[in-house]
């Protein structure tokens, strides 16, 4: 059996993408699973440029029984944001342009997710507002 997970794109415009992630765990959890594939985001409608990366503009989340790590994908993944277990919050980073991707060698622009401390019945709901980059 596997965790019951969903990834739902709420908005995917020229500048902003909003994605909802959910998980109801069967106890297996997730390990470095790609949740945001920037190459799959909509291209810029004005010039056709493909999205090459994102900044984390805002995160709204609720976790029950497990913690979650969002990771910037690279040869050696780096932490984008830690989501505490049994916690609900709304963090807005748009006032300073968003959380930058700090990955080094092999940087893809994608965001991965890993759960820790998961047991059967634990869950998360995460809504990410992403600021798209076309460089």
Task: Show the residue positions of the predicted features.
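C-terminal interaction-tip segments
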Residues: 1-15, 115-135
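N-terminal low-complexity, intrinsically disordered "leader/linker" segments enriched in small/polar
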Residues: 1-60
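Extended, low-complexity, turn-rich repeat/linker tracts enriched in Gly/Pro/Ser/Thr and Asp/Glu
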Residues: 60-69, 118-120
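Short, surface-exposed beta-strand/strand-loop-strand elements in extracellular ectodomains
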Residues: 64-85
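An anionic, turn-rich surface loop/hairpin at beta-sheet edges
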Residues: 78-100
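Noncatalytic modules at the cell exterior or secretory-pathway interfaces
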Residues: 97-124
